[in-house]
């Protein structure tokens, strides 16, 4: 199958992870999956939610939003509408769950890290790009907190890496990392979140048209794990680079 942008079915879009994008946030990453661009800012605060106080454990949570003109037609800001949409809540919770899968709460101490993931430009896979970029922003925020002794230097709050990618079946062909034009044509689409050692955090799959078979599910999961392995390596390379603060 010939894809719109010339990629093979097993190929990611060009992925870039730019650290230190905002000077104010303790961790800041602009992540790009092709034309999808998401700004991920991590903010560290001392203390935890009331229900967590006295536990000696920290907390990590996330919020997701799209800029009004992130898509080809303008959408109203949810703050103007006066309510947060169900999709926004769902994706915010997904990002938070994904990051918490690789957090040692005890090692984090009673500190809170909030990840704000704002979609600047959308071309499919915004939630998976957000998870992938937010992990790097979280890692930088943890390093910042350790440098300021909010977290003990000998502790390791991050137990591993986490990334995410979309997969789907379009015109009978399993594809990795769908663009918007592919996503809307997909008979089956799926978002897969993996740890760096290949375990699954979350698998969200839907048959938009024909139900999918077990062997097709296995093929999609194989595609996704291979994609997440590539993304984990890109995260590692990004974090290995020197970051000037």
Swiss-Prot record:
The record's listing under InterPro entries reads:
ExoRNase_PH_dom1, ExoRNase_PH_dom2, ExoRNase_PH_dom2_sf, PNPase/RNase_PH_dom_sf, Ribosomal_Su5_D2-typ_SF, RNase_PH, RNase_PH_bac-type, RNase_PH_CS
- What does it catalyze? tRNA(n+1) + phosphate = tRNA(n) + a ribonucleoside 5'-diphosphate
What are the disulphide bonds in this sequence? none
Q: Which domain of life is it from?
A: Bacteria
Q: What is its EC number?
A: 2.7.7.56
Q: Which UniProt keywords apply?
A: Nucleotidyltransferase, RNA-binding, rRNA processing, Transferase, tRNA processing, tRNA-binding
A GO molecular function for this record?
Answer: tRNA nucleotidyltransferase activity
Q: Where does phosphate bind?
A: 87, 125-127
Which top-level enzyme class is recorded in the Swiss-Prot or TrEMBL entry?
Answer: transferase
Q: Name one GO biological process term.
A: rRNA catabolic process
Could you tell me what this protein does?
Phosphorolytic 3'-5' exoribonuclease that plays an important role in tRNA 3'-end maturation. Removes nucleotide residues following the 3'-CCA terminus of tRNAs; can also add nucleotides to the ends of RNA molecules by using nucleoside diphosphates as substrates, but this may not be physiologically important. Probably plays a role in initiation of 16S rRNA degradation (leading to ribosome degradation) during starvation.
Q: What binding partners and quaternary form does the record give? A: Homohexameric ring arranged as a trimer of dimers.
- Similarity comment: family membership: Belongs to the RNase PH family.
What is this protein's record name?
A: Ribonuclease PH
| Source organism | Streptomyces coelicolor (strain ATCC BAA-471 / A3(2) / M145)
Lineage start:
Bacteria, Bacillati, Actinomycetota, Actinomycetes, Kitasatosporales
């Amino acid at each position: 199958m010939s894809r719109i942008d010339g990629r093979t079915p097993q190929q990611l879009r060009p992925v870039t992870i730019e650290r230190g994008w905002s000077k104010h946030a303790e961790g800041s990453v602009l992540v790009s999956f092709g034309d999808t661009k998401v700004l991920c800012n991590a903010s560290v605060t001392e203390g935890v939610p009331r229900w967590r106080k006295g536990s000696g454990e920290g907390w990590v949570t996330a919020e997701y939003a799209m800029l009004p003109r992130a898509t080809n037609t303008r959408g109203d800001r949810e703050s103007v509408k006066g309510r947060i949409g169900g999709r926004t809540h769902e994706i915010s919770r997904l990002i938070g769950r994904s990051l918490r899968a690789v957090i040692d709460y005890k090692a984090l101490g009673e500190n809170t890290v909030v990840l704000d993931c704002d979609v600047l430009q959308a071309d499919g896979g915004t939630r998976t790009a957000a998870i992938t970029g937010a992990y790097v922003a979280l890692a930088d925020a943890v390093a910042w907190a350790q440098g300021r002794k909010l977290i003990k230097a000998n502790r390791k709050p991050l137990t591993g890496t986490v990334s995410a990618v979309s997969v789907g079946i379009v015109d009978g062909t399993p594809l990795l990392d769908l663009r918007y034009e592919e996503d809307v044509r997909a008979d089956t689409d799926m978002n897969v979140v993996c740890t760096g050692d290949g375990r699954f955090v979350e698998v969200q799959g839907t048959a938009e048209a024909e139900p999918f078979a077990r062997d097709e599910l296995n093929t999609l999961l194989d595609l996704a794990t291979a994609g997440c392995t590539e993304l984990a390596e890109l995260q590692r390379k990004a974090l290995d680079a020197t970051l000037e603060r």
